[in-house]
Protein backbone atom coordinates (compact mmCIF):
# COMPACT_ATOMS: atom_id res chain seq x y z
CA UNK A 1 0.00 0.00 0.00
CA UNK A 2 1.24 3.50 -0.81
CA UNK A 3 2.42 5.74 2.00
CA UNK A 4 1.43 9.36 2.49
CA UNK A 5 4.82 10.89 1.69
CA UNK A 6 5.16 9.13 -1.65
CA UNK A 7 1.59 9.95 -2.67
CA UNK A 8 1.88 13.61 -1.73
CA UNK A 9 5.21 13.92 -3.51
CA UNK A 10 3.70 12.39 -6.65
CA UNK A 11 1.07 15.16 -6.68
CA UNK A 12 3.59 18.00 -6.82
CA UNK A 13 2.55 18.94 -10.36
CA UNK A 14 -1.20 18.52 -9.79
CA UNK A 15 -2.87 21.91 -9.48
CA UNK A 16 -4.98 22.65 -6.43
CA UNK A 17 -5.20 24.56 -3.17
CA UNK A 18 -4.48 21.77 -0.71
CA UNK A 19 -1.51 22.14 1.62
CA UNK A 20 0.56 19.25 2.94
CA UNK A 21 -1.10 19.45 6.38
CA UNK A 22 -4.52 19.40 4.76
CA UNK A 23 -3.56 16.42 2.62
CA UNK A 24 -2.40 14.62 5.76
CA UNK A 25 -5.77 15.24 7.41
CA UNK A 26 -7.61 13.86 4.36
CA UNK A 27 -5.27 10.86 4.31
CA UNK A 28 -5.83 10.12 8.00
CA UNK A 29 -9.61 10.44 7.89
CA UNK A 30 -9.97 8.27 4.76
CA UNK A 31 -7.44 5.73 5.98
CA UNK A 32 -9.27 5.02 9.23
CA UNK A 33 -12.51 4.00 7.50
CA UNK A 34 -13.39 0.30 7.25
CA UNK A 35 -14.55 -1.48 4.11
CA UNK A 36 -18.16 -0.65 3.31
CA UNK A 37 -17.75 3.04 4.18
CA UNK A 38 -18.73 5.86 1.83
CA UNK A 39 -16.75 9.02 1.07
CA UNK A 40 -18.11 12.01 -0.87
CA UNK A 41 -16.05 14.94 -2.11
CA UNK A 42 -17.82 18.07 -3.36
CA UNK A 43 -15.53 20.13 -5.56
CA UNK A 44 -12.70 18.13 -7.12
CA UNK A 45 -11.05 20.60 -9.53
CA UNK A 46 -8.11 18.67 -11.03
CA UNK A 47 -8.16 15.79 -8.56
CA UNK A 48 -5.42 16.66 -6.08
CA UNK A 49 -7.50 15.92 -2.98
CA UNK A 50 -9.35 12.93 -4.43
CA UNK A 51 -6.04 11.28 -5.31
CA UNK A 52 -5.14 11.50 -1.62
CA UNK A 53 -8.51 10.20 -0.42
CA UNK A 54 -8.60 7.29 -2.86
CA UNK A 55 -4.97 6.34 -2.27
CA UNK A 56 -5.52 6.17 1.48
CA UNK A 57 -8.96 4.52 1.61
CA UNK A 58 -9.04 0.78 2.24
CA UNK A 59 -10.35 -1.65 -0.38
CA UNK A 60 -14.13 -1.76 -0.19
CA UNK A 61 -14.53 1.94 0.61
CA UNK A 62 -16.77 3.69 -1.95
CA UNK A 63 -15.63 7.12 -3.15
CA UNK A 64 -17.66 9.74 -5.04
CA UNK A 65 -16.23 12.89 -6.62
CA UNK A 66 -18.86 15.53 -7.42
CA UNK A 67 -17.89 18.46 -9.64
CA UNK A 68 -19.74 19.94 -12.64
CA UNK A 69 -16.55 21.37 -14.12
CA UNK A 70 -18.86 24.02 -15.47
CA UNK A 71 -16.65 27.11 -15.45
CA UNK A 72 -18.09 28.87 -12.41
CA UNK A 73 -16.52 29.07 -8.93
CA UNK A 74 -13.40 27.57 -10.46
CA UNK A 75 -10.94 29.11 -8.02
CA UNK A 76 -9.97 32.31 -6.19
CA UNK A 77 -11.44 35.28 -8.06
CA UNK A 78 -12.67 32.98 -10.87
CA UNK A 79 -16.40 33.04 -10.26
CA UNK A 80 -17.86 32.77 -13.77
CA UNK A 81 -16.98 32.63 -17.45
CA UNK A 82 -14.34 29.91 -17.37
CA UNK A 83 -16.11 27.18 -19.34
CA UNK A 84 -13.14 26.47 -21.61
CA UNK A 85 -10.77 26.16 -18.67
CA UNK A 86 -13.29 23.98 -16.84
CA UNK A 87 -13.47 21.51 -19.71
CA UNK A 88 -9.70 21.27 -19.55
CA UNK A 89 -9.96 20.76 -15.77
CA UNK A 90 -12.37 17.90 -16.42
CA UNK A 91 -9.93 16.10 -18.71
CA UNK A 92 -6.97 16.77 -16.43
CA UNK A 93 -8.97 15.50 -13.44
CA UNK A 94 -9.58 12.15 -15.13
CA UNK A 95 -5.95 11.92 -16.25
CA UNK A 96 -4.66 12.69 -12.76
CA UNK A 97 -6.83 9.98 -11.21
CA UNK A 98 -5.53 7.53 -13.80
CA UNK A 99 -1.92 8.55 -13.21
CA UNK A 100 -2.41 8.02 -9.47
CA UNK A 101 -3.82 4.56 -10.13
CA UNK A 102 -7.19 5.32 -8.53
CA UNK A 103 -9.46 6.04 -11.51
CA UNK A 104 -11.33 2.75 -11.11
CA UNK A 105 -11.93 3.43 -7.42
CA UNK A 106 -13.74 6.74 -7.88
CA UNK A 107 -17.30 7.28 -9.07
CA UNK A 108 -17.23 10.66 -10.78
CA UNK A 109 -20.47 12.64 -10.93
CA UNK A 110 -20.16 15.57 -13.31
CA UNK A 111 -23.02 17.48 -11.72
CA UNK A 112 -23.74 20.26 -9.30
CA UNK A 113 -23.93 18.88 -5.79
CA UNK A 114 -27.64 19.60 -5.37
CA UNK A 115 -28.34 17.61 -8.56
CA UNK A 116 -26.35 14.57 -7.42
CA UNK A 117 -28.19 13.61 -4.25
CA UNK A 118 -30.06 10.73 -5.88
CA UNK A 119 -26.82 9.29 -7.28
CA UNK A 120 -25.54 8.50 -3.79
CA UNK A 121 -27.94 6.25 -1.94
CA UNK A 122 -25.97 5.37 1.20
CA UNK A 123 -25.22 7.38 4.31
CA UNK A 124 -21.80 8.97 4.43
CA UNK A 125 -18.87 8.24 6.70
CA UNK A 126 -16.76 11.12 5.41
CA UNK A 127 -17.86 14.26 3.58
CA UNK A 128 -15.32 16.73 2.18
CA UNK A 129 -16.78 20.04 1.01
CA UNK A 130 -14.62 22.22 -1.23
CA UNK A 131 -17.20 23.53 -3.67
CA UNK A 132 -18.46 27.05 -4.35
CA UNK A 133 -17.32 29.53 -1.72
CA UNK A 134 -20.28 31.89 -1.77
CA UNK A 135 -22.63 31.68 1.21
CA UNK A 136 -25.68 30.22 -0.53
CA UNK A 137 -24.05 27.27 -2.34
CA UNK A 138 -21.61 26.61 0.52
CA UNK A 139 -24.40 26.47 3.09
CA UNK A 140 -26.51 24.35 0.75
CA UNK A 141 -23.68 21.82 0.35
CA UNK A 142 -23.04 21.61 4.08
CA UNK A 143 -26.73 21.43 5.01
CA UNK A 144 -27.93 19.08 2.27
CA UNK A 145 -25.01 16.66 2.24
CA UNK A 146 -24.14 17.02 5.91
CA UNK A 147 -27.55 15.57 6.73
CA UNK A 148 -26.39 12.38 5.00
CA UNK A 149 -23.40 11.88 7.32
CA UNK A 150 -23.76 9.10 9.90
CA UNK A 151 -23.49 9.74 13.61
CA UNK A 152 -19.79 9.52 14.33
CA UNK A 153 -18.94 10.46 10.74
CA UNK A 154 -16.73 13.38 9.80
CA UNK A 155 -17.25 16.57 7.82
CA UNK A 156 -14.23 18.43 6.41
CA UNK A 157 -14.75 21.92 4.98
CA UNK A 158 -12.07 23.73 2.97
CA UNK A 159 -11.73 27.52 3.04
CA UNK A 160 -13.14 27.65 6.57
CA UNK A 161 -12.17 30.83 8.42
CA UNK A 162 -10.72 32.10 5.13
CA UNK A 163 -13.60 32.57 2.67
CA UNK A 164 -16.31 34.96 3.86
CA UNK A 165 -19.12 32.87 2.33
CA UNK A 166 -17.89 29.57 3.75
CA UNK A 167 -17.25 31.06 7.18
CA UNK A 168 -20.74 32.59 7.30
CA UNK A 169 -22.13 29.17 6.38
CA UNK A 170 -20.30 27.69 9.36
CA UNK A 171 -21.61 30.41 11.66
CA UNK A 172 -25.16 29.51 10.63
CA UNK A 173 -24.79 25.73 10.48
CA UNK A 174 -22.08 24.60 12.91
CA UNK A 175 -21.40 27.27 15.52
CA UNK A 176 -24.61 26.59 17.46
CA UNK A 177 -25.34 23.12 16.12
CA UNK A 178 -26.46 20.23 18.31
CA UNK A 179 -25.14 17.82 15.65
CA UNK A 180 -21.70 19.13 14.65
CA UNK A 181 -18.73 19.30 16.99
CA UNK A 182 -15.67 21.23 15.84
CA UNK A 183 -12.52 19.14 16.23
CA UNK A 184 -9.82 21.39 14.77
CA UNK A 185 -8.36 22.54 11.48
CA UNK A 186 -5.36 22.33 9.18
CA UNK A 187 -4.97 25.91 7.97
CA UNK A 188 -8.39 26.55 6.37
CA UNK A 189 -9.60 22.94 6.42
CA UNK A 190 -11.95 22.53 9.38
CA UNK A 191 -13.01 19.16 10.78
CA UNK A 192 -16.33 18.33 12.45
CA UNK A 193 -17.80 15.16 13.95
CA UNK A 194 -21.51 14.45 13.66
CA UNK A 195 -23.66 13.00 16.40
CA UNK A 196 -25.97 13.85 19.28
CA UNK A 197 -23.89 15.87 21.73
CA UNK A 198 -24.12 17.10 25.29
CA UNK A 199 -24.60 20.77 26.11
CA UNK A 200 -21.05 20.89 27.45
CA UNK A 201 -19.68 19.47 24.20
CA UNK A 202 -21.68 21.99 22.18
CA UNK A 203 -20.46 24.91 24.29
CA UNK A 204 -16.88 23.72 23.89
CA UNK A 205 -17.35 23.43 20.15
CA UNK A 206 -18.73 26.97 19.95
CA UNK A 207 -15.84 28.34 22.01
CA UNK A 208 -13.25 26.63 19.80
CA UNK A 209 -14.88 28.01 16.65
CA UNK A 210 -15.08 31.52 18.07
CA UNK A 211 -11.37 31.25 18.84
CA UNK A 212 -10.70 30.90 15.09
CA UNK A 213 -12.16 34.31 14.24
CA UNK A 214 -8.87 36.22 14.70
CA UNK A 215 -7.31 33.82 12.16
CA UNK A 216 -10.26 34.55 9.85
CA UNK A 217 -9.79 38.31 10.23
CA UNK A 218 -6.07 38.03 9.47
CA UNK A 219 -6.80 35.98 6.35
CA UNK A 220 -9.14 38.71 5.13
CA UNK A 221 -6.40 41.29 5.64
CA UNK A 222 -3.96 39.10 3.69
CA UNK A 223 -6.42 38.74 0.82
CA UNK A 224 -7.01 42.48 0.57
CA UNK A 225 -3.28 43.19 0.58
CA UNK A 226 -2.53 40.50 -1.99
CA UNK A 227 -5.37 41.73 -4.22
CA UNK A 228 -3.87 45.22 -4.01
CA UNK A 229 -0.48 43.75 -4.97
CA UNK A 230 0.97 44.65 -1.57
CA UNK A 231 2.77 41.36 -0.97
CA UNK A 232 5.60 42.98 1.06
CA UNK A 233 3.07 44.39 3.52
CA UNK A 234 1.26 41.04 3.73
CA UNK A 235 4.56 39.24 4.35
CA UNK A 236 5.45 41.73 7.07
CA UNK A 237 2.24 40.70 8.82
CA UNK A 238 3.15 37.01 8.55
CA UNK A 239 1.74 35.96 5.17
CA UNK A 240 3.72 33.46 3.10
CA UNK A 241 2.87 35.51 0.03
CA UNK A 242 0.39 32.90 -1.21
CA UNK A 243 -3.40 33.18 -1.18
CA UNK A 244 -4.44 31.92 2.28
CA UNK A 245 -5.87 28.41 2.17
Annotated model-derived regions:
Residues 2-20, 24-245:
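S-adenosylmethionine/decaboxylated-SAM
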Amino acid sequence: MADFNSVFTSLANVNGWMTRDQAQRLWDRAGELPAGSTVVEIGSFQGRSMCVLASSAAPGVTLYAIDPHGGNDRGPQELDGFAEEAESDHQIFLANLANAGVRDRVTYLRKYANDATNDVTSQLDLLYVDGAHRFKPASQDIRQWGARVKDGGRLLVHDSFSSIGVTLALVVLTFFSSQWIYEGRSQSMAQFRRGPNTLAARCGSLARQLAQLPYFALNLVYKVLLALKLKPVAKALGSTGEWPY
